[in-house]
Amino acid sequence: MDYLDLGPYSSASGTVRLPGSKSISNRVLLLAALAEGETTITNLLDSDDTRVMLDALGKLGVKLARDGDTCVVTGTRGAFTAKTADLFLGNAGTAVRPLTAALAVNGGDYRVHGVPRMHERPIGDLVDGLRQIGAQIDYELSEGYPPLRIKPATISVDAPIRVRGDVSSQFLTALLMTLPLVKAKDGQAVVEVDGELISKPYVDITIRLMARFGVTVERDGWQRFVVPAGVRYRSPGRIMVEGDASSASYFLAAGALGGGPLRVEGVGRASIQGDVGFANALMQMGANVTMGDDWIDVRGIGHDHGKLEPIDMDFNLIPDAAMTIAVAALFANGTSTLRNIASWRVKETDRIAAMATELRKVGAIVEEGPDYLVVTPPEKLTPNAAIDTYDDHRMAMCFSLVSLGGVPVRINDPKCVGKTFPDYFDRFAALAKA
């Protein structure tokens, strides 16, 4: 097995410019593909998840011209030209869910599949929502999970569409992005969310990006959404992808644990991503954080004892960045509790189980619940722990931070970071110092 040995490091400082946001990159690619006109996307993330989206769009007949982190997309005016396609989407939830919805109303014959873990990640709530408007979608193996067969169908929106919100916000995102393409009574489609909507900031990203492409979604709280139906997305001409706020969390934590000063460029106060809220959680733990419109600075910890304060917080809004808090909790002077993180169970791996297992390897006492994690740090971190990453990019990036505790750590299968941040470890090594 491939592995990477890190540390021991005693400090971290410098400046890092973030790669483009995965969540924004894949949404913008699909919106540009469905729009009228040509869109130039800059700072597009180059990673496994964006590559599978680009490959799929190419197979669907979308004209794409890439040059570095810029991509020019010629829109299809609301309908993909390819009416049959076999689409492999890896383990990219940000690709498989919105594309499934767009394909369901495209009047073609499609197969959607991915890696084995993708076939364990739920999609049933989205399929149920699409079937309410007439979509013809069959499960190939297990009910509620990919692979999917999508067939031509007569689509009509005659009543509010109901969708569960408590498993993944991507089901709602997929419906919102697709409904402008279909005709509806009174020219509008209504989506009603059953249960508590998780990861609300990600839905906010969707709505803001749809507005950039000329479609305004109205919402009543987070339970009812009204979407103009039978309208065209229109290209904004140029759109820049802001830096990935989830990826920022590792460097911000490094600036706290390693003393800083460490500046992250590409996200800040003006960001549309909820994961910039990670900076507030870090401040609650005692880190010295300052923020500009598109940068965040961290300069160590503001306590004489040099340890973070423990945290007890609901992370429903920022589940991805919460993983970084779980590892930062190793450096706190007490027990931390991460609440409302049930969505971790259906991500790239069962992240609650994986995080508990790996935190114990470095000496933590961990209590794992259905939707929470309680982390008590050890007196001293266990050196030379071999961290398994479960083919999960965020596990690999989070646990790099252990090396800032003055102990060496081994990261197994480090290449899994290719999903969102292929050169993460090079960037981390440039900031960390022995």
Swiss-Prot record:
- What reactions does this protein catalyze? 3-phosphoshikimate + phosphoenolpyruvate = 5-O-(1-carboxyvinyl)-3-phosphoshikimate + phosphate
Gene Ontology annotations of biological process type = amino acid biosynthetic process; aromatic amino acid family biosynthetic process; chorismate biosynthetic process
Under the GO molecular function aspect, what terms does this record hold?
3-phosphoshikimate 1-carboxyvinyltransferase activity
Enzyme class, UniProt record, top EC level: transferase
Kindly report the protein's main subcellular placement as a broad class.
cytoplasm
Q: In which pathway does it act?
A: Metabolic intermediate biosynthesis; chorismate biosynthesis; chorismate from D-erythrose 4-phosphate and phosphoenolpyruvate: step 6/7
Q: Which residues form the active site?
A: D320
Q: Where do the annotations place 3-phosphoshikimate binding?
A: K22, S23, R27, S168, S169, Q170, S199, D320, K347
GO CC terms for this protein? cytoplasm
Compartment(s): Cytoplasm
Q: Which domain of life is it from?
A: Bacteria
| Residues given in the record as phosphoenolpyruvate binding sites | K22, G93, R121, Q170, R351, R394, K419
Annotated keywords = Amino-acid biosynthesis, Aromatic amino acid biosynthesis, Cytoplasm, Transferase
E.C. no? 2.5.1.19
> What quaternary structure, including any partners, is listed in this protein's UniProt entry?
Monomer.
Homology family = Belongs to the EPSP synthase family.
**What role does it play?**
Catalyzes the transfer of the enolpyruvyl moiety of phosphoenolpyruvate (PEP) to the 5-hydroxyl of shikimate-3-phosphate (S3P) to produce enolpyruvyl shikimate-3-phosphate and inorganic phosphate.
Q: Could you identify this protein by its name?
A: 3-phosphoshikimate 1-carboxyvinyltransferase
